[in-house]
């Protein structure tokens, strides 16, 4: 009861809109496809009109191609609007933001998976809707957000930030893995015994399951869901998690800019969050429109992932009529291999985020691993001696002596395949 009280108190103070949205999602999950698409059209028309009136970026873009908000009469008219690229978002961040006095906004930042991090303001209504969508997905598995849970996500090694993280985790009945070293890992596995769900980066969940199986550690028996997000879930991941947890990894697909795009139901189908987003598939690539966020409009956003949509005729035995994503093919999560230990690739995000946050040093980067225990950091500009020293300090903070590395500035950062990746590994295990 304590954790429920703390959760509801914090939720209602931070996100006053969320209760109403949870009730709405409970009702709308029973809607027909036709009713869902009628709602989507209404929200799209509102979004386009609002963006045209309050965002200089969208007004200029629409005027340049002679498109007026009144031209959007059906969902098919979405293709009249220009595509928004990641480059557009990073270059025109200020102009995309709307000039409107929202009562409450939150600062949001992307993970910088392409080597560049975006920071923008998300209005309270959109933030609440996104959180409501996650809670609603958990309800399909009889999970409450305040249930004890293991978290495979980010953390920061600075003393103050680590204390803050531990405190917030305690209040949210949450614990997280801070490393794969024996003592820390064993303590984490002990806590898993009483957890109701675990969630986070799929590659970290896989690594944990693999170690539990290899070390023949006690297997959790109370878990109701293992949820992976932000990375592609390979079948070999599920082979290990079924052995370790008795469950496959359930997929939650989304992005900071778009909000939750899809959530996998207990029948194994990834239903699109049609109340929150519009999804298009163009040449197997996803374009997403965030229907709920007005503070920083995201319309026809080229997310950079490759997907396969199911036929509109496909019906799920769970009874929901929301359209289905058959597969997300573009998100691949890799581990970093030291001489002795294995690390999550999100360490790179924190290394460069810390440089920006603490020293105002912004670097466009790509990290290459061809051999275990060795990393190549490629930077696309000249870096000063003091910047290099600070970068070395951050790298050592996360990897210590377990990794040898070189830093090459003025590098040409290349894409691997069609999608630019901030970490490329030649090691596959």
Residue spans for each PLM region:
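AMP-binding/adenylate-forming catalytic core of the ANL superfamily
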Residues: 198, 301-399
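Short, hinge-like loop/turn segments at secondary-structure boundaries
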Residues: 167-168, 216-218, 267-271
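General small-molecule cofactor/ligand-binding pocket signal
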Residues: 175-178, 250-252, 404-409
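Short, structured coil segments at secondary-structure junctions
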Residues: 170, 222, 244-248
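Adenylate-forming
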Residues: 179-183, 195-236, 251-256
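Conserved AMP-binding/adenylate-forming
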Residues: 233-314
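Nucleotide 5′-phosphate-binding alpha/beta core
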Residues: 1-109, 115-148, 155, 197-199, ...
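AMP-binding/adenylate-forming
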Residues: 128, 132, 136, 148-204
């Amino acid at each position: 009861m304590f954790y429920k009280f703390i959760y509801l108190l914090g939720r209602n103070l931070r996100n006053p809109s969320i209760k109403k949205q949870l009730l709405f999602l409970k009702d709308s999950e029973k809607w027909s496809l036709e009713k869902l698409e009628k709602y989507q059209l209404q929200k799209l028309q509102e979004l386009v009109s609002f963006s045209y009136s309050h965002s200089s970026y969208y007004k200029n873009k629409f005027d340049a191609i002679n498109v007026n908000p009144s031209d959007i009469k059906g969902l098919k008219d979405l293709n009249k609007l220009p595509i928004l690229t990641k480059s557009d978002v990073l270059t025109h961040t200020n102009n995309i933001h709307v000039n409107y006095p929202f009562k409450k906004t939150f600062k949001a930042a992307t993970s910088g998976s392409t080597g560049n991090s975006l920071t923008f303001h998300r209005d309270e209504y959109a933030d609440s809707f996104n959180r409501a969508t996650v809670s609603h997905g958990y309800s399909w598995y009889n999970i409450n957000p305040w249930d004890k849970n293991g978290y495979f996500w980010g953390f920061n090694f600075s003393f103050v930030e680590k204390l803050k993280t531990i405190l917030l985790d305690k209040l949210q009945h949450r614990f997280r893995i801070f490393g794969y070293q024996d003592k820390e890992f064993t303590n984490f596995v002990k806590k898993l015994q009483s957890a109701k769900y675990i969630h986070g980066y799929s590659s970290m969940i896989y690594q944990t399951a693999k170690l539990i199986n290899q070390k023949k550690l006690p297997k959790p028996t109370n878990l109701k869901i293992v949820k992976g997000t932000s990375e592609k879930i390979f079948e070999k991941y599920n082979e290990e998690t079924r052995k370790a947890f008795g469950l496959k990894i359930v997929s939650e697909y989304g992005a900071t800019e778009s909000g939750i795009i899809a959530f996998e139901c207990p029948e194994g189908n990834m239903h699109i969050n049609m109340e929150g987003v519009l999804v298009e598939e163009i040449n197997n690539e996803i374009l997403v429109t965030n229907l709920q966020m007005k503070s920083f409009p995201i319309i026809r956003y080229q997310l950079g992932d490759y997907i396969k949509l199911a036929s509109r005729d496909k019906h799920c035995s769970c009874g929901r009529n929301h359209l289905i994503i058959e597969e997300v093919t573009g998100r691949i999560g890799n581990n970093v291999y030291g001489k002795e230990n294995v690390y999550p690739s999100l360490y790179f995000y924190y290394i460069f985020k810390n440089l920006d946050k603490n020293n105002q040093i912004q670097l466009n980067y790509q990290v290459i691993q061809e051999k275990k225990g060795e990393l190549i950091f490629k930077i696309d500009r000249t870096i000063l001696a003091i910047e290099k020293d600070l970068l070395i300090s951050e790298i050592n903070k996360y990897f210590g002596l377990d990794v040898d590395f070189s830093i090459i500035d003025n590098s040409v950062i290349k894409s691997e395949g069609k999608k630019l990746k901030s970490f490329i590994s030649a090691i596959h295990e």
